[in-house]
Structures are given as structure tokens and as C-alpha cells.
Amino acid sequence: MSVITSSGNVISLDLDDTDIYQHFEDSKSCAKIILSQINSDRIYDRFLKNQKDMIILDIGANIGLFTLYAKDSASHIFSVEPTPSHQKLFEKINGPYDNVTLVKAALSGTDESMNFYICDYNSTCNSLIDRGSDVIEVEGLTFKSLLEKYNIDHVDFCKIDIEGSEMLAITEETLKPVYDKIDRMFIEVHATYSGPDMRWEDNLVINRRKIETVLQNVGYKYEILPSRYNDTIHVFKDIHTK
């Protein structure tokens, strides 16, 4: 099992490591789905293939598969992940690389300790959104504080996949201060509610439109990328860089 990077290099994953092996065998981890998006679907190639010397943010880094994919395109990647078990695997997978920094925190709307919910049916769904799961306390960082803490002056590409937490982290108040610093984003939007009065698919559309409004009001342009649920937004500044 391996990751095919943005430059086409093949990096084998150490399945002799019991923790890594068990994570990929655990149906609740979605690790194989994430790997398929990277290796087979190549969903990030349009933005990163054969690029060099980029500053990249990996928000919702999980165990670091996207970070591993993108490291060839980066002068440095800052990977944000609040789940302790994912952090442990991330360090095993990306530990050898000098251009990778793991940020043990959650992107959020405020700079304070936050309740973070560990999903019992799918560890990929861990989130700041309460889905009735176990709770831990994690550090919360806004975009502005994240960039200031790590002395990041410019971001070429920011991937965000944080399982509903985007509804708290991506607001006009958090995005305006960093508009001049973040050029391009790839945002996966998630449903944060489902019940007898609303399907999760309908809630996802509502959430996506809220994010679209934020992006427009801040000054970004965007497009909805083709996907099963139309849940992925490509965010950019200049129509000529689309």
C-alpha cells in the first residue's frame, strides 16, 4: 500500500507497523477511501501536480495521507489535526520529512480550548460539531492565529476537510483578516444536522450556501467541483488562476 505523490513518486506505507496496519483495516477509519481519492481519483492534481516550493495548509490532516501526497509540491506544509490517535499515526507516516509541521489543534472560530467530539462510528468524522460522541478538550486556533503562531506570511494552497467544523471556522470574521495571505482553498463541506424535519443532504446544501456567502462577502471567487454530493468548493482570487 502506497501514496502516489503530486510529482508521481510512490511512497510505501509501513504496514509492518501494527498501528498503521490496523488503522487501514478498520472499516471505521475511511483510510482506504481517502487513499483512493488521492491515488485513483487524483482530486488534488489540478492544483498541485508538478508544482514546487508552495506553502500549503492541510486543515484536517487526519493521519497525514494528503500531507504525504503534497509534500513534493511544498517548501513547507503545516498540517492541523486535533485527534490524538491520528496525530500518532501522522508522526509515523510523515515524521521523516523536514518540510512538514504537525499542528496539534483544531481550526475554529475562536482562540481557546474547545470541546472536540470523537465519533464512535467513524473516526474520520471527529469534529467540533457535537454528534453525541465522546468529548475531549483541544486547542482551537483561528486562521489568523494559526498563521501568526507559525510565522506564515503567505499560503499558496489550503485544503480544508474538517467534518462540519468548517461552519464554525470559516466565517467573515475569521477569513477577512487572512484574505491577503491565502490564495487558494479546497473546502469539503459537510452536513451538521439531520432529523425528521430535514435530510442530511438538504442540510449539506444549506451549509454549502452559507460558506459560499462568506466567500463572496470576503472577496473570493469559487466554483463547485464535480462530486457525488456537490460538497467540494474550489476557492480562488483571480479568474485567470482558476
Residue ranges and their predicted role:
Residues 90-100:
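Short, conserved SAM-binding/catalytic segment
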Residues 16-46, 103, 108-145, 149-150:
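Glycine-rich adenosyl-binding loop in Rossmann-like folds that engage adenosine-containing cofactors
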Residues 70, 90, 116, 169-170:
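Hydrophobic packing residues within well-ordered alpha-helices of enzyme cores
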Residues 76, 99-101, 137, 221:
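Conserved beta-strand segments of alpha/beta enzyme cores
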